[in-house]
């Protein structure tokens, strides 16, 4: 992946892609699942993916949050690399001619006045002028065939679509569905501002929209009825400071007296000091705006051929059976994504220990798992462990300490923690083409994984392996002590009520006691290739 900061470097890179399909995903960084869904869609439909990361000062007002807008370059870099992005363009304001110190002395792109009469525009004067200026600048620099925007920013989407059409820019603007948390809250970088209590209040935006949507679904297309239903729901959340609640045409953004064909029900409100926006499209073709679980980006439009889905490999087994080492090596050989689920549980355990959270306080542990942003990046080689960041701080080495090892199975047994992390694991692995290892991947996280492997080894063998790992880190722990710890952890893992350690009924058992790491790796690779021969999915290019 190339991380570029200058226009010259970007132009040089893009010039090498002549004749290929290039996709652009414009962002302001602090990436979350919403951005990742755009990136996944782009990678499915284009030969090359460019992600721009630019906190655009031109779209912030004098009293807005440009200075404190969340920035996480290290985490963004890791996420983009893991997602398979080809180029990240991350210029500074001076490079884009958007230095706040120069004021208004530059060329601006002015959106049509008719698109600035409703929704956010009256409350944020100049905002969409700044958005349009930088987006068109990016389109000119990258010259993509396709550019991907989220439906959550519906007014921005409508303005960009109109400008591209009016100026005859040869780029297809691809709208992508809003990605939501389980309670309906739309993913947003500004969600990071919210406290735990504010996070619960914020879910009221979606509930209000959903109430209006359900009213429309029940047969009343009038704006009066739809808006009244949404306002009635807002009365249950008085902490929300409503800025606007409007029903408009999705393309013209003009107010609608009733929904004849399509409508956009949009809301903006303050939760404490944080301004949040959201919307739902009222359209017979749209379908339910939120199924029971998190809704990810819409599938590619008709006529687009997506790459065939590659199988998932689920590797389970007890601590010390060699899962992580083997999984990394298999993923590297087969050119698959490697997801170290154990590192996620270790990260929450380490954070709990650092913050003094009692490990028997399930509520606090669950809240910690829900609020912590975890970023994982595969090592540069099959022998390098997964790098992991928690809220922007790298903790790769810290989570491998004996203290974390001692308590991680205790934290992993907390139902709320497992629920939060499993949700993230499923999000990452849902498109296939990944190797996941843990203790319940094949039985709980991905019970439909195409290839399930359960690695075993004796307690003595696993203790020796762990001792060698610790010695390499300069730590000396007696072998008998390690055996006792492993036996205790085996009992906890196998006896816990939630997702106990056990092989899936269709898992292939491999005893690693007398096998080298490369021999175990070869067995799994052979099983994978046999699976491909039987099912005929995507060809492997290795």
Curated annotation (Swiss-Prot):
This is Bifunctional pantoate ligase/cytidylate kinase. Catalyzes the condensation of pantoate with beta-alanine in an ATP-dependent reaction via a pantoyl-adenylate intermediate. GO terms for biological process: nucleobase-containing small molecule interconversion; pantothenate biosynthetic process; pyrimidine nucleotide metabolic process. Its main location: cytoplasm. It catalyses: (R)-pantoate + beta-alanine + ATP = (R)-pantothenate + AMP + diphosphate + H(+); CMP + ATP = CDP + ADP; dCMP + ATP = dCDP + ADP. Residues 281-542 are annotated as: Cytidylate kinase. (R)-pantoate binds at residues 59, 156. It holds the Pfam family Pantoate_ligase. Gene3D superfamilies: HUPs, P-loop containing nucleotide triphosphate hydrolases, Pantoate-beta-alanine ligase, C-terminal domain. Its EC number is 6.3.2.1, 2.7.4.25. Residues 287-311 are annotated as: Disordered. The active site is at residue 35. Beta-alanine binds at residue 59. GO terms for molecular function: ATP binding; CMP kinase activity; dCMP kinase activity; pantoate-beta-alanine ligase activity. The gene is panC/cmk. InterPro entries: Cyt_trans-like, Cytidylate_kin, Cytidylate_kinase_dom, P-loop_NTPase, Pantoate_ligase, Pantoate_ligase/cytidylate_kin, Pantoate_ligase_C, Rossmann-like_a/b/a_fold. GO terms for cellular component: cytosol. Pathway: Cofactor biosynthesis; (R)-pantothenate biosynthesis; (R)-pantothenate from (R)-pantoate and beta-alanine: step 1/1. Keywords: ATP-binding, Cytoplasm, Kinase, Ligase, Multifunctional enzyme, Nucleotide-binding, Pantothenate biosynthesis, Transferase. ATP binds at residues 28-35, 150-153, 179, 187-190. Residues 1-280 are annotated as: Pantoate--beta-alanine ligase. It is found in: Cytoplasm.
